[in-house]
């Protein structure tokens, strides 16, 4: 489903011209890295499953309750709605008007690519492609998606840091979680640098200008103009950040409801400790879409919560299956676009 053409923001004089210059080309394949990630994911899953009873795991899955599954799926739908609202706030801040329905369809297709490709980059490419025409600039559309990502990262790391502190208060000490707190502070510093300290930001971009390549210079100019406009609209940034925090809360509720669907009592407070930490750790580019890492982290927490490894694996796998099932709707929309 295509997006309607709307006027580009008047504050971007270079937006339309920038795409006329040829882009530098290049690329390489990384099959060895992909194989290493696959091996790690498989190894972690095998390690976790080694300590489980497959019969007990099957019995857990047999207890699934459809009403609770529907409730969990509704949380995923709410997550999409809030995410689209965040995205629209950032587009509006750049004077780009795109209908909510078009953004929702684009985000849903992006979810499909995120869940069925080995990284999240494919989904971002979809979102950029769908908004480049209304924005009048691929660079502008890319910058907006990247800002959305940075704010989402700040929210995730902040909630993850709170989760790590909550785990310590419950007597669950996770080695290395101090780096989540360091990461949250670093993400906050990055946001301040990007949006509210133009002098320092321009110094950071100076090496790119020094390259002297017209293609790079044009895109850096659009990037700086876009960040300047965001800096003049702090309420839009605050709203998008608040939306990102809400998304993290909704994901916590999704996993708590997924556990309930399996007759596993995972209190919301415990889910609020477990899920953010798991999400942060599975961001590490060492596995295929977090497989293995997620199950290992869930097992670590569930054992300490007295719930058992089988329950951890069941909740993790069912949650992943529901997310992938939901994202199949995006795959259907993608096929409709092609016809």
Model-derived features: where do they sit?
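Predominantly cytoplasmic-facing regulatory/coupling regions of multi-pass membrane proteins
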Residues: 1-108, 166-283, 309-339
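Transmembrane alpha-helix interface/packing and boundary motifs in multi-pass membrane proteins
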Residues: 110-119, 276-291, 295
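Selective transmembrane-helix segments that form parts of the transport pathway or gating/packing helices
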Residues: 149-154, 320-324
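Membrane-interface alpha-helices at helix entry/exit sites of multi-pass transporters
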Residues: 101-105, 119, 123-124, 134-150, ...
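Re-entrant/interfacial helical elements at transmembrane boundaries that shape
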Residues: 123-132, 288-304
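Extended non-transmembrane interhelical loops and adjacent amphipathic helices
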Residues: 92, 104-133, 217
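Transmembrane alpha-helix termini and helix-breaking/packing motifs in multi-pass membrane transporters
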Residues: 158-170, 304
